A protein has these predicted regions:
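Hydrophobic alpha-helical bundle cores within soluble ligand-binding/oligomerization subdomains
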Residues: 2-297
Length: 297
């Protein structure tokens, strides 16, 4: 039986097998051009590969002049609304915008006051993990990577859902809203678990507060004393809004298209998307930014 401590070891036998894999796993790069095979989601001319159609969001970062791509100031639209107009709207009324924009992206129209309040209440009601989930799933095998922790937790949520395989619009909407509510909990709890077990930090698990906005709730869960300023919450809220959607052609969204097209359940599709987002050429690139700043220090 293999010793657990050597689980990650690269043995001489594995090195030999890897050599064979390299020798017999090569394809002539010229064949990709010959047969017009797209290597990833970027074409040879630098444009994104058209992989589908969406009216959920749109992003423009260049214009075409005489067949040349000319960079321009970026423009981001959610359901036809300029992101600047959306932000101006909720900032002018001193509101948090994440919930409002989530409603817009999900349902295609901006909510009125009552619809927004109902949606916020629904998000708050779903802000609760199953009994012993934190202890059994998050605490017992803390991951050093938040995307890994999220993907594993999302897959496990399947076991708690009596309608996990129901792909009707009504059920997928329910599952989606629940996951939106639970992602902050899972992410922060996993972060605290890792810091506790691997870095020796104190373990602090705050109970959820359904009355807080998503941005406020994240900061409350993250801070040992649960305290944050309004400016911090508003800045985080703005960051969440800007990162919600960007055109539908990115790697993790494409992964969701591919996986969900088989008719699989919501949890499997989202876990696959999180696996894509974890990669260093996608969302995982943010980790390199942190490492760069650490190196500068």
């Amino acid at each position: 039986m293999q010793n657990y401590n050597s689980y990650s070891e690269i043995t001489p036998e594995l090195l030999a097998l890897s050599k064979l894999s390299r020798e017999h796993g090569q394809i002539d790069p010229a064949l990709y051009t010959k047969y017009e095979v797209k290597r990833g989601l970027r074409d040879l001319n630098g444009k994104g590969v058209l992989a589908g159609l969406t009216d959920i969001s749109e992003i423009t970062s260049y214009i075409i002049e005489d067949s040349d791509m000319i960079p321009c100031d970026g423009r981001l639209y959610y359901r036809g609304y300029k992101i600047q107009d959306l932000v101006t709207g909720f900032e002018k009324e001193n509101r948090y915008g994440f919930e409002e924009v989530a409603y817009l992206l999900l349902f295609g129209q901006l909510p009125d006051k009552q619809a927004l309040e109902n949606f916020q209440q629904l998000l708050g009601e779903y802000r609760s993990l199953p009994t012993h989930f934190v202890r059994d799933i998050i605490m017992k095998a803390p991951s050093k990577d938040m995307m890994n922790a999220l993907a594993r937790s999302v897959l496990t949520m399947y076991a708690y859902d009596d309608r996990a395989d129901d792909t009707s619009i009504e059920n997928v909407v329910r599952q989606s809203i629940q996951l939106i509510s639970l992602f902050p909990l899972i992410s922060v709890y996993a972060y605290h678990a890792y810091n506790h077990y691997h870095d020796g930090a104190s373990l602090i698990i705050h109970p959820p507060k359904p009355e807080l906005s998503t941005a406020e709730h994240l900061l409350y869960l993250l801070r040992p004393d649960g305290q944050y300023t309004e400016l911090e919450a508003k800045m985080l809220d703005l960051g969440l809004v800007l990162h919600m959607e960007h055109g539908g052609g990115n790697n993790s969204t494409f992964t969701t298209h591919v996986v969900s097209s088989s008719g699989t359940d919501t949890y499997s599709a989202i876990a696959a998307a999180l696996g894509s987002l974890k990669g260093p050429k996608h969302g995982g690139a943010n980790v390199k930014v942190v490492k760069m700043f650490d190196d500068l220090k």
